[in-house]
């Protein structure tokens, strides 16, 4: 209640004082109010009015610098009107003129009260502002957190937990068993360090979690906080640097000062690449401030002070931009790769997230895990949540396989659009998708077809889905060529059925992808006549922390040879696609008829059509 009254008084008091000051000023200076309400007239026109006998009375103010004149205005039928006239400094002839014309005039000296109130009003308003700002600064200085703290810029914004209760333990983390094992050792060290020190082991000073977004790096940190019985500090890398010089380094010092007081403890820095980027390339003062912050971080982690009992756990998905001094042993003794989960990892993650969902007994998590290669843990959690929302939308009480499959399609390809009307365009799209599906079926190294559909999603008017048999960590040349042939089969089918002049832009994305794959075969994988040589630009991107300018190291002759080889690969694959499609034209016509009628063909039905024709 007291805080509320303080806020009310703090807001109302300056307003009341301001209103009182203005009212007092206006009360003592009625002449000014009179002047404000008057119209203005030039001095020359005023003299003309005197000569025309249209002036009745003149009142002089401000030491004869201003005159309020009572005139007869001929423009409004001779009615009287008050006007204001600014007089020149030397206007002695004015008094003579007024006397000669027998015009009543009077001089009004300045009031001492008015001058005093005017002086006080000019002084009081800035004084109120200064006192109010000082009150806010005092209040912010007493507080330990929150915005508007002018004296606390150098204080670290880390969240401190004596025994963090995040609600997450290692049992809640699945699919990244290797990373869990490494971090469980650190938790065990904090709980009972004697069994480690007995054999001469020392506690790691830093652990860097590296991996793509959504793989569970922050989740692992929460699990550490939930498992360890040690003090836990958490902060984001972006919270160190501010607009003021020196604030970042000051916050690093403050953070580690607090951490040393609670040692042994854990400091978790999320997105450390925001402050730990490679030094020496940026332009401008902002980069200098970031480098000062990084230098202070390096000193605190392994400087002259030696072992402090503070374990730093950091997370990043951009290890390539981090400064090499930050990555050396003694600062980050362990670099733990948190990769995208394989099929077994995805299955374990799905089991964890499905515990709190009402899943129908017919749902096969193994099939879902196989259908989601490349999905991170966050993607899988989002998948089941989307399926749950879709279940409620459809009025069901349990999540079925249909909702999960539709959610996978939505996440990968976007929202489902309106079905196409029966037309020539619909048949053209059907031939395009049937070309992809049939060509892939007759390529021994290609993934099997999972579904063919004419339901639009995002920019795609039709889609052909493939189901990989397993996670492909190593891809062969035959597999890459098979993917290129199947991708070009859509354009090839359009040309076979409708002729070259009628091909559409529908294959634009296919052409973009196959060009990239073919160029990778030549310049990176050494799978061409150019030979096993890496021709990619090895320099890093501009401004990510290493090189200021990118360099192109290939000769013009080699660039021409690469382009020629890429065109040769794509041309050969296109010819093979046309050959496969021409040999199976009747099968493709059957698939197209089914597609136009049903709009979606699942894997079992598609294979039944293929087996009947073959």
Curated annotation (Swiss-Prot):
Keyword Repeat part of the UniProt annotation: no
Enzyme Commission (EC) number:
3.4.24.-
Q: Which residues cross the membrane?
A: 8-28, 117-137
Family the entry assigns: In the central section; belongs to the AAA ATPase family.
* Required cofactor names: Zn(2+)
Q: Please name the catalytic residues of this protein.
A: 433
Return one GO MF term. zinc ion binding
Q: What does the Swiss-Prot or TrEMBL cofactor note state?
A: Binds 1 zinc ion per subunit.
Q: What is this protein called?
A: ATP-dependent zinc metalloprotease FtsH
